[in-house]
Amino acid sequence: MLRFSDVKYRYYTDLFEFDLNVEQGSVVAILGPSGAGKSTLLSLLAGFIEPESGDITINNESQLSLAPHQRPLSMLFQEHNLFAHLSVAENIGLGIKPNLRLNEKDKKRINDAARQVGVDDLLQRLPEQLSGGQKQRVALARCLVQQKPVLLLDEPFSALDPILREEMIVLIQALIKSEKLTVLMVTHSLQDAKALASHYAFICQQKVLSQGRISELFTQEKPPELTQYLQAVK
């Protein structure tokens, strides 16, 4: 469904080289030490940066000529990126139309997405009136209204306390199932990876060194770099 084929990206003296296959409907935890290239991989997929060679395809269609908003994916960051002067409803509506010229059908999509993530009673509030967990739910609703099949998560739970973190994991588990999403999730938490992911990809030294089912992470023979990483983050 989603493939990085001999993708190369250079940042100053660092050369990133990615080969990765993601099956439709899978949830892939992107693991690896800081600076290894995890967020770089997501940025390449999202179209925020361009590779110098190789191809990135979704359903056998190259994404390289498409602008970020044209790609069949949405992205949830560690920082929720809500606009302080816009209401919750308007922040969600940006996922449909950036100019916020919303018709009744659009407003229904906003209400439906807000209900799915549990913020339908907060639609008229401003971000400053929300808790951290509520802000992240609003950002997730903005992803949902885009109705795109691939969801990218870049350490979305790292700023949340343990209770809110667990609530978000349960919520995203339900949304993955109901919306039939394919997910790539950058995380440093093995607990989050085991809770959400069906597969993993381990990035080290700017390459994908290992990938497989999450159930194999602690049982199969693996590169020494992955063994060392797992011991460090336990």
From Swiss-Prot:
Major localisation: membrane
Q: Point out the gene that encodes the protein.
A: thiQ
Identify this protein by name.
Thiamine import ATP-binding protein ThiQ
Q: What is its EC number?
A: 7.6.2.15
Positions of the ABC transporter domain: 2-230
In terms of Pfam families, this protein maps to: ABC_tran
Gene Ontology molecular function terms on file? ABC-type thiamine transporter activity; ATP binding; ATP hydrolysis activity
UniProt keywords (A-Z) are: ATP-binding, Cell inner membrane, Cell membrane, Membrane, Nucleotide-binding, Translocase, Transport
Q: Which reaction does it catalyse?
A: thiamine(out) + ATP + H2O = thiamine(in) + ADP + phosphate + H(+)
State the similarity comment: Belongs to the ABC transporter superfamily. Thiamine importer (TC 3.A.1.19.1) family.
**Binding positions for ATP?**
32-39
Sorted alphabetically, the Gene Ontology cellular component annotations on this record are: plasma membrane
Family annotation (InterPro entries): AAA+_ATPase, ABC_SmlMolc_Importer, ABC_transporter-like_ATP-bd, ABC_transporter-like_CS, P-loop_NTPase, Thiamine_ABC_ThiQ
Originating organism: Aliivibrio fischeri (strain ATCC 700601 / ES114)
Is-annotated flag, keyword Flavoprotein?
no
Which membrane topology describes this protein?
Peripheral membrane protein
